[in-house]
């Protein structure tokens, strides 16, 4: 593909130095450059891609896209490559990857789901609804991508994949005849333009609560990042006969902020107020949820293995997307009922024990509050003793939103009977200091160390302690890691799986893959 043709996709080009050339592929890592490649020099938080232009050209790059003016780049072999200057290299990378694959999202109806909590579950529900409708559907979540019969793991930690992966997944979907796709869109993915060049037709939000102020700086900046998905509806590529629809949560503060963004149609869902999509007669049990789903086209009884009020809200969001796609109520209800569970989301681990053992991804204050409230409901059901307790294991990540540590410690202190604070990706921060911040907040809520509050640095030992403390009817819940397959200490990712750790703990053993383990 010619460079001129590729760069026609860019929102803006500030200057062009050199001639038109044939491009082999688009890369943003100088170590991956092959002869004939276009190298995108992206300024990062700690490393500036402009520093590697010379290396990229030496490896054979014939063109470079960057932000800095040529005169600031110093001595380079200018006659041997073309330099295209843009206002935002990261955004350009997204558009270039989309153009390289001939804008695959324009060949299907694309749904984007964003929000603080519940995105992955909602995406799985939407995908199931599409399948129930007999659509040739695809999905990209922070857990996996599903393309035809193929399922691809999308990474160690949960965020929207980088532009080359996003566009490759969509291109593979287009090649296999996918007509409808749903994508989980994180705030990082939006702020870093990972979905630039993705033309969404439906934008849906679960909720926008406290999260990621370490990255975005302020709650307002975080909210603005989420809003980009809705802001882009009006300017995105129009597909024949496919309307642009915004799906909004009237129960969430984001409703007031997102509802003014223009769309062909706004579909509103709510657990408690007037809306297009609602639920009534909600019955929560420890192993399933029943409710009547009220849609513009009628009412349907829904029964799902997903538990908790928050999952009813996720189901309503997915149902509203189904309405946006013009699907029948019975099809929507069938899809909701088909999802048996989502990896690492209120996932039960069974080994014949007389208490419930659960793994959940809850890693934000709101999510922790919701899962602990649900765990309390579960502990009080099914003939359990009135004294059945909730035992929580959780931690807070290093180099991330510090305010969450006290907030989550306070919530755990209020809502759990026994609190065990442990590691969750401490990175280069002191694990002891992270745990101390959460422990202080739990103590302020009346918890006493050594009585109903413990700090256990090794996560495997923490989960084992929780299981050893459990009595018949109790609920043990390990929060924060969910389906993730690694934990970061320093700058190293160590193999880790909360579900395997829980299975071992139920056998009286520990998963000892972390540097905190006692060997």
Task: Cite the ranges covered by each PLM segment.
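A short, gly/pro- and small-residue-rich
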Residues: 49-61, 83-88, 92, 201-206, ...
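Acidic, Mg2+-coordinating active-site environments of NTP-dependent enzymes
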Residues: 72-79, 176, 199-357, 441-442, ...
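Short, well-ordered alpha-helix to beta-strand connector turns
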Residues: 23, 36, 61, 80, ...
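ATP-dependent carboxylate-amine ligase
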Residues: 1-14, 32-38, 44, 48, ...
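Short internal beta-strands
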Residues: 62-68, 245-250, 393-394, 417-425
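Phosphate-binding loop of NTP-binding sites
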Residues: 91-248, 256-262, 316, 510-514
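N-terminal leader/targeting and accessory segments in enzymes
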Residues: 1-95, 99, 275-278, 301, ...
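Short secondary-structure boundary segments
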Residues: 66-69, 185, 207, 250, ...
């Amino acid at each position: 593909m010619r460079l001129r043709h590729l760069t026609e996709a860019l929102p803006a080009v500030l200057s062009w130095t050199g001639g038109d050339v044939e491009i082999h592929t688009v890369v943003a890592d100088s170590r991956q450059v092959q002869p004939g490649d276009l190298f995108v020099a992206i300024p990062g938080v700690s490393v500036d891609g402009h520093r590697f232009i010379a290396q990229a050209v030496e490896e054979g790059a014939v063109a470079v896209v960057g932000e800095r003016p040529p005169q600031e780049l110093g001595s380079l072999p200018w006659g041997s490559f073309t330099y295209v200057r843009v206002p935002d290299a990261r955004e350009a990378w997204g558009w270039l990857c989309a153009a390289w694959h001939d804008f695959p999202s324009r060949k299907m109806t694309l749904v984007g789901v964003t929000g603080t909590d519940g995105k992955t579950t909602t995406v799985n529900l939407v995908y199931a609804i599409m399948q129930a409708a007999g659509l040739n559907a695809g999905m990209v979540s922070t857990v996996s991508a599903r393309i035809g019969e193929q399922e691809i793991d999308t990474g160690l930690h949960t965020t929207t994949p980088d532009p080359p992966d996003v566009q490759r997944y969509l291109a593979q979907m287009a090649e296999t005849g996918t007509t409808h796709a749903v994508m989980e869109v994180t705030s990082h993915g939006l702020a870093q333009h990972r979905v630039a060049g993705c033309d969404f037709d439906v934008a849906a939000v679960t909720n926008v609560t406290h999260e990621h102020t370490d990255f975005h700086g302020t709650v307002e900046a975080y909210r603005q990042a989420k809003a980009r998905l809705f802001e882009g509806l009006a300017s995105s590529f129009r597909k024949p006969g496919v309307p642009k629809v915004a799906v909004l949560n009237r129960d969430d503060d984001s409703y007031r902020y997102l509802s003014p963004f223009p769309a062909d149609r706004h579909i509103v869902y709510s657990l408690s107020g007037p809306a297009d999509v609602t639920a009534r007669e909600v019955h929560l049990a420890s192993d399933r949820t029943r409710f009547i789903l009220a849609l513009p086209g009628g009412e349907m009884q829904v029964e799902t293995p997903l538990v908790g009020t928050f999952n009813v809200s996720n189901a309503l969001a997915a149902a509203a997307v189904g309405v946006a796609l013009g699907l029948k109520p019975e099809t929507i209800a069938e899809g909701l009922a088909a999802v048996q569970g989502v990896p690492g989301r209120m996932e039960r681990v069974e080994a014949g024990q007389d208490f419930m053992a659960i793994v959940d991804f809850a890693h934000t204050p709101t999510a922790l509050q919701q899962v602990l409230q649900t765990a309390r409901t579960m502990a009080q059901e099914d003939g359990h003793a009135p004294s059945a307790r909730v035992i929580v294991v959780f931690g807070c990540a290093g180099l991330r939103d510090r305010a969450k540590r006290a907030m989550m410690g306070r919530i755990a202190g209020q809502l759990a009977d026994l609190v065990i604070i442990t590691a969750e990706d401490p990175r280069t921060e002191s694990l002891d200091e992270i745990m101390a911040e959460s422990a202080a907040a739990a103590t302020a809520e009346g918890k006493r160390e050594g009585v109903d509050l413990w700090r256990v640095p090794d996560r495997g030992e923490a989960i084992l302690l929780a299981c050893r403390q459990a009595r018949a009817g109790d609920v043990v819940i390990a929060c924060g890691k969910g389906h993730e397959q690694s934990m970061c200490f320093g700058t190293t990712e160590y193999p880790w799986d909360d579900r395997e750790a829980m299975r071992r703990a139920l056998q009286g053993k520990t998963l000892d893959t972390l540097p905190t383990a006692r060997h």
